[in-house]
Amino acid sequence: MKFTPPPASLRNPLIIPEKIMMGPGPSNCSKRVLTAMTNTVLSNFHAELFRTMDEVKDGLRYIFQTENRATMCVSGSAHAGMEAMLSNLLEEGDRVLIAVNGIWAERAVEMSERYGADVRTIEGPPDRPFSLETLARAIELHQPKCLFLTHGDSSSGLLQPLEGVGQICHQHDCLLIVDAVASLCGVPFYMDKWEIDAVYTGAQKVLGAPPGITPISISPKALDVIRNRRTKSKVFYWDLLLLGNYWGCYDEPKRYHHTVASNLIFALREALAQIAEEGLENQIKRRIECAQILYEGLGKMGLDIFVKDPRHRLPTVTGIMIPKGVDWWKVSQYAMNNFSLEVQGGLGPTFGKAWRVGIMGECSTVQKIQFYLYGFKESLKATHPDYIFEESNGFH
């Protein structure tokens, strides 16, 4: 037998330097979470795997604040959660209303169109949320099957209020789908109390777990819609009836669906255990306090926040306006090269306009915020010696 020679690049050891991940995600994981991934790989029907999956479901119901039986994980990053919700709840010709003021709602538009949905949109500026009145008028006008909202937009640092939206949706026989990828465990979230029908979040964001697994939950009302589809879900991999069966959500004998990443489930279990040990209230309070320290520190540098109204700022992701004449990329590169500090640029509506800093995972402490402020300031000084640090007036 003859084969091509092995690649020379694989003869070298794998060396990944430590980085302080203070962008909008993924975030740094704790040693406890990383160690969990070193457990032995388990097969699809090992009892220890099913026990851990049950514990993960318990933890997810806690952080979502729900009693939903159909609470589970899909394999893939947070985009997988968006795909799973839209592909299961929408059929060809179904009308969906998407509130667009950031890149994630734009992605939802594209995905919904690919499934043949009748997509209607309302659009708003990326630094201001939609009012309850605006959403109510749009629902009354379009009479959609589903409304899609982004709770916390990591492309801008905007927080969308949700209280009251679910009630309005249900008055018009509409399901509420929520993207809580960047917000969950950083601000209050009550799935059942707020009458949310479908939600997904990102393991690699505030939760502090690795990417590649996405927690989701669907209400009994949404589950009934899926069970009564005219056609099967177009994507076998995201079929929540099949996947939910494997996760033990439906009081049925479990059937193999696909090979899950057992070691990511172990890691997520430990991340959820850490949240449970500290308590949701304390987790959220800590991140809000860290965000306030960040705001004050940036204000002393003369920097402005992309979302002007403090009531609408997402504590877990802050957009920092790039001053005129400043090369944002030089600042980011200097911070990484000299401090191993991630200073990430904007995305979507903030690309070229703002940096984005995340208060997520292990980077949600006063010490980490102080280090970020120091590294960011030194990077700005080194790359732009003429920049004048004058305290901003519009910061508090």
Curated annotation (Swiss-Prot):
Catalyzes the pyridoxal 5'-phosphate-dependent transamination of both 3-hydroxykynurenine and L-kynurenine to xanthurenic acid and kynurenic acid, respectively, preferentially using the alpha-ketoacid glyoxylate as the amino group acceptor. Although glyoxylate is the preferred amino group acceptor, transamination of 3-hydroxykynurenine also works with pyruvate as the amino acceptor in vitro. Involved in the detoxification of cytotoxic metabolite 3-hydroxykynurenine generated by the hydroxylation of L-kynurenine, an intermediate in the tryptophan catabolism pathway. It is an enzyme of class 2 (transferase). The lineage of its organism: Eukaryota, Metazoa, Ecdysozoa, Arthropoda, Hexapoda. Keywords: Aminotransferase, Peroxisome, Pyridoxal phosphate, Transferase. It comes from Anopheles gambiae (African malaria mosquito). The keyword Transferase applies. Its EC number is 2.6.1.63, 2.6.1.44. GO terms for cellular component: peroxisome. InterPro entries: Aminotrans_V_dom (IPR000192), Aminotrans_V_PyrdxlP_BS (IPR020578), PyrdxlP-dep_Trfase (IPR015424), PyrdxlP-dep_Trfase_major (IPR015421), PyrdxlP-dep_Trfase_small (IPR015422), SP_NH2Trfase/AEP_transaminase (IPR024169). The modification N6-(pyridoxal phosphate)lysine is found at residue 205. Pyridoxal 5'-phosphate binds at residues 77-79, 154, 204, 256, 259. Homodimer. Optimum temperature is 60 degrees Celsius. At physiological temperatures (30 degrees Celsius), retains 60-65% of its activity. Its cofactor is pyridoxal 5'-phosphate. This is 3-hydroxykynurenine transaminase. Residues 43-44 are annotated as: Binds to and confers specificity for 3-hydroxykynurenine. Expressed in gut and ovaries. Substrate binds at residues 154, 356. The keyword Acetylation does not apply. Optimum pH is 7.8. It is found in: Peroxisome. GO terms for biological process: glycine biosynthetic process, by transamination of glyoxylate; glyoxylate catabolic process; L-kynurenine catabolic process. Pathway: Amino-acid degradation; L-kynurenine degradation; kynurenate from L-kynurenine: step 1/2. Belongs to the class-V pyridoxal-phosphate-dependent aminotransferase family. It catalyses: L-kynurenine + glyoxylate = kynurenate + glycine + H2O; 3-hydroxy-L-kynurenine + glyoxylate = xanthurenate + glycine + H2O; 3-hydroxy-L-kynurenine + pyruvate = xanthurenate + L-alanine + H2O; glyoxylate + L-alanine = glycine + pyruvate.
